[in-house]
């Protein structure tokens, strides 16, 4: 089942074009020709014998598919910046059970009806929408003022019906504001005007701010060119994204202007931040322009091109979206599957408060904490932080690793502190709930603590047991859990049976090159290693 993330039409792509409608449809042979010329991976031999478009596109990734003229019109509405469309007002992703609600748009019908993000629409007007797909999404769209009844499965397994009134939702995808010396850019998607909004917002307000908070939570992506333009306001001139095509040829997308600020960016992300959002966030990290806080992002490291009647003779109002490139952020790292790992893992209910605390200033009359993160200085006013956002302050100190560079400022001077000392100075316990009591003597203590702070590895009862052994199969299971990756494919190793409990994890890790066999086509799943060997 393909997993697609978009805002009722907003998807990450390299470019978008205008269209006219037509009843003529794309043939399987024509679609195969498009894919063979552009798709980033080699198509399997079986794809040549596909009997339908659905069968053909089943051999591609989650982001490559055909759009009818009507679906393409809806798609274009989502990537052109400030748009109006009649729908339920929700950002969605397809899952095998139906349609998952990633977020709801302000003033949209979903918000008014009380549809909660994270729930799954399993039926529309009483008809199952499993597996989720474009044909079901179309049922959520309609004329403004009409209603649609959806059956939703909540996180606890219970179900409920909601009647949602479709509304003409006007969505400005980027807003810029300044409060108390802190700039706040709220960006819901990267459309054609987003780069301009960022550039004008930073240029016009930079003299009034100490730091810039860029909120990309729930931002499913958009145009890569918009992400590069927005990032350039903070990074300045340079190659900010690299594309690699089916032939292994690479090309860089360069920003040629000057940076518009020397203030650090604090990027807010969550699991709904994808694609162009990850280009921006990964670029901020790669160029040393700031930090990322929140939770790990979605993990989409491929870019698409759009084919329509303007650039393909086979198409007449309809369109094909094709994954044509793998992309790499400034600094050379990929976000594919893994996502952007935040500098500070902060629970979402504390993320905004934590960002504002990190946007403090070097005070003269009260104690402050200076954090050096990714080459940038961040100041926390301790008395103000403890009074207004004690939970957020504790979340920041919990997210830091023992090697964090911290300075305590007071009475005109500064002195360096350890993380434990900083926690105590702020009124918290020297150790956090994530600290392990049995790793201090391990030569890999720093690596273990860093991964624990990022919520990538977990202990049990405050212990990590670094000398305990794990089988190679168990290592793959831990990696799969950390990366949220599993595979139904088989054939990588002769001793990894398709029905074994570890096969999905081992095959997924082998597919992305994180593990290899021991020779002779074998993996040796029951061979052991220590946990600290696993960390390295």
Regions found by a protein language model. Name each.
Residues 100, 122, 135-176, 323-324:
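PDZ-domain C-terminal substructure recognizer with occasional recognition of PDZ-binding tails
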Residues 3-25:
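Sec-dependent N-terminal signal peptides of Gram-positive bacterial secreted proteins and lipoproteins
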Residues 177, 182-432:
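C-terminal "post-core" interaction segments
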Residues 26, 83-131, 192:
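PDZ/PDZ-like domain segments forming the peptide/carboxylate-binding groove
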Residues 4-5, 409-445, 458-473, 480-505, ...:
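Feature responds to low-complexity, polar/acidic, surface-exposed segments characteristic
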Residues 120-151, 199, 226, 301-311, ...:
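PDZ domains, with a preference for the canonical peptide-binding region formed by the helix
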Residues 27-80, 149-151, 155-156:
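Interdomain regulatory linker/hinge segments that flank or connect interaction modules
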Residues 62-103, 163:
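PDZ/PDZ-like peptide-tail recognition elements
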């Amino acid at each position: 089942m393909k997993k697609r993330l978009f805002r009722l039409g907003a998807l990450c792509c390299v470019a978008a074009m205008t269209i006219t409608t037509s009843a003529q449809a794309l043939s399987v042979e024509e679609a195969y020709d498009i894919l063979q010329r552009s798709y980033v991976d080699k198509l399997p031999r079986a794809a040549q014998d596909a009997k339908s478009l659905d069968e053909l596109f089943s051999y591609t990734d989650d982001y490559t598919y055909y759009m009818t003229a009507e679906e393409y019109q809806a798609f274009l509405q989502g990537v052109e910046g400030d748009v109006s469309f009649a729908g339920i007002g929700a950002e969605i992703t397809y899952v095998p059970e139906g349609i998952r609600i990633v977020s709801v748009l302000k003033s949209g019908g979903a918000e008014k009806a009380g549809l909660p993000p994270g729930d799954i629409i399993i039926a529309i007007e009483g008809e199952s929408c499993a597996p989720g797909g474009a044909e079901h999404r179309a049922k959520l769209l309609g004329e403004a003022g009409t209603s649609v009844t959806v059956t939703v499965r909540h996180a606890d397994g219970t179900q409920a019906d909601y009647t949602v009134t479709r509304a003409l939702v006007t969505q400005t995808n980027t807003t810029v504001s300044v409060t108390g010396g802190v700039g706040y850019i709220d960006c819901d998607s990267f459309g054609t005007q987003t780069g301009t909004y960022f550039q004008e917002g930073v240029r016009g307000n930079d003299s009034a701010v100490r730091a810039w908070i860029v909120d990309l939570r729930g931002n499913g992506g958009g145009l890569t060119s918009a992400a590069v333009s927005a990032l350039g306001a903070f990074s300045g001139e340079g190659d900010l994204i690299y594309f690699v095509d089916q032939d292994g040829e690479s090309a860089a997308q360069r920003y040629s202007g000057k940076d518009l600020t020397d203030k650090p960016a604090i990027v807010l992300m969550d699991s709904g931040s994808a694609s162009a959002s990850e280009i921006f966030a990964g670029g901020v990290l790669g160029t040393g322009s700031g930090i990322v806080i929140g939770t790990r992002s979605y993990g989409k490291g491929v870019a698409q091109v759009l084919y329509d009647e303007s650039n393909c003779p086979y198409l007449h109002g309809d369109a094909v979206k094709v994954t044509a490139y793998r992309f790499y952020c400034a600094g050379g790292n990929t976000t594919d599957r893994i996502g952007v790992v935040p500098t500070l893992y902060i629970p979402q209910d504390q993320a905004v408060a934590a960002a504002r605390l990190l946007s403090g200033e070097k005070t003269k009359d009260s104690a402050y904490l200076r954090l050096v993160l990714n080459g940038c200085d961040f100041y926390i006013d301790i008395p103000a932080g403890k009074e207004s956002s004690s939970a957020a302050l504790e979340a920041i100190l919990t997210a830091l690793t023992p090697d964090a560079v911290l300075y305590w400022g007071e009475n005109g001077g500064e002195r360096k502190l350890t993380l434990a000392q900083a926690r105590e100075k702020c009124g918290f316990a020297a150790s956090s709930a994530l600290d392990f009591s049995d790793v201090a003597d391990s030569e890999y203590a720093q690596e273990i603590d860093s991964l624990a702070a990022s919520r990538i590895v977990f202990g049990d009862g405050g212990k990590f047991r670094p000398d305990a052994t794990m089988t190679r199969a168990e290592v793959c299971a831990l990696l799969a859990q950390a990366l949220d990756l599993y595979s139904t494919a088989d054939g990588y190793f002769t001793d990894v049976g398709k029905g074994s409990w570890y096969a999905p994890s081992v095959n997924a890790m082998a597919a992305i090159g994180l593990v290899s066999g021991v020779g002779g086509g074998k993996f040796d799943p029951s061979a052991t290693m220590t946990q600290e060997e696993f960390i390295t």
